[in-house]
Amino acid sequence: MLIDQFDRKINYLRISVTQRCNFRCLYCMPKIPFDYQPKENLLSFEELFLFVKATIDEGIEKIRITGGEPLLRKDLSIFIKMISDYKSDIDLAITTNGFLLKDFAKDLKNAGLKRLNISLDTLDHKKAKTLAQKDVLDSVLSGIDEALNLDLKVKLNTVALKNLNDDELISLLEFAKSKKAQIRFIEFMENTHAYGKLQGLKRDEIIQILSQKYQIQLIKKDEKAPVSIYKADDYEFGIIDPHSHEFCDSCNRIRLSAEGLLIPCLYFDEASSIKEAVRKGDIKAAVEILQEVLRNKPEKNKWSVVDNETSSRAFYQTGG
């Protein structure tokens, strides 16, 4: 079992398999980065799996594959199959922008994937092109339909932004309901790589907008994640509210970057590399590095909205 210095059980591993993305979303990576790691600096899927297997043995129960855009990484379905074959009942999911999903959904399902989180910030073609700086909406919607047709469980993620999609929150909720998918509205998390003029909606503002049409009722607050579950009449949706709901006391996650950096907290600059240990085949040493990272995992993040601090680490490097 993995326990940090504050007696928190760590059972959730988020793996960023690539920094690259085919969108240039205003809230994440509006400009082409100059800090992409060359391919040789990235851990191969075989190397990643050696470490992942060890973390499962140590108590990891949930794995989320992220990016960048994970579907840009060649042979991702092979990596999914490695994990699924090793532990078929592990909670294994991918977060994707959905653009390539129509082409890859079947392979992912056959590899053992059961769940997807898909970004959907707007149903308007013009706004989608503004947000992603690319004409993406038709491909994303096709990807969502393909995943649902294959009986993959789908959650839709919407970053709620003032003057961009705040007039669509009800429409997005109703779209998700029509697809029998759960939507989760996300408070914008400030970071130094985002477009500087963006302003996000807070939880209460999201609820206020949805309340214009629906009776909103809080039904569940997950203490191990910054998500609260609500009902709009008979439909359940989520709000991921890091501004409004501090969950550090029960944080259960650790992050691994594509180049082998173990990151204890999204808003914490320190990180430790397992690359050398893994490439030497010394998985015991890699696990010891993981345990040391957990001993140094902070009690709380260093994000202070009052002081207008932002994350200096790019979310496309850590998967958000």
UniProtKB/Swiss-Prot annotation:
Pfam families per record: Fer4_12, Mob_synth_C, Radical_SAM
First and last residue of the signal peptide: none
Known pathway: Cofactor biosynthesis; molybdopterin biosynthesis
EC supergroup of this enzyme: lyase
Alphabetic keyword roster: 4Fe-4S, GTP-binding, Iron, Iron-sulfur, Lyase, Metal-binding, Molybdenum cofactor biosynthesis, Nucleotide-binding, S-adenosyl-L-methionine
Catalytic function, reaction form: GTP + AH2 + S-adenosyl-L-methionine = (8S)-3',8-cyclo-7,8-dihydroguanosine 5'-triphosphate + 5'-deoxyadenosine + L-methionine + A + H(+)
Cofactor note: Binds 2 [4Fe-4S] clusters. Binds 1 [4Fe-4S] cluster coordinated with 3 cysteines and an exchangeable S-adenosyl-L-methionine and 1 [4Fe-4S] cluster coordinated with 3 cysteines and the GTP-derived substrate.
Biological process annotations from GO: Mo-molybdopterin cofactor biosynthetic process
Required co-factors: [4Fe-4S] cluster
Lineage: superkingdom: Bacteria
Domain Radical SAM core stretches: 5-225
Enzyme Commission numbers on file: 4.1.99.22
Binding site for GTP: R14, R64, T95, K155, R253, I254, R255
Binding residue positions for S-adenosyl-L-methionine: Y27, G68, S119, M189
Annotated positions binding [4Fe-4S] cluster 1: C21, C25, C28
Gene Ontology MF: a single term: metal ion binding
Family from the record: Belongs to the radical SAM superfamily. MoaA family.
Quaternary organization: Monomer and homodimer.
Function: Catalyzes the cyclization of GTP to (8S)-3',8-cyclo-7,8-dihydroguanosine 5'-triphosphate.
Protein name: GTP 3',8-cyclase
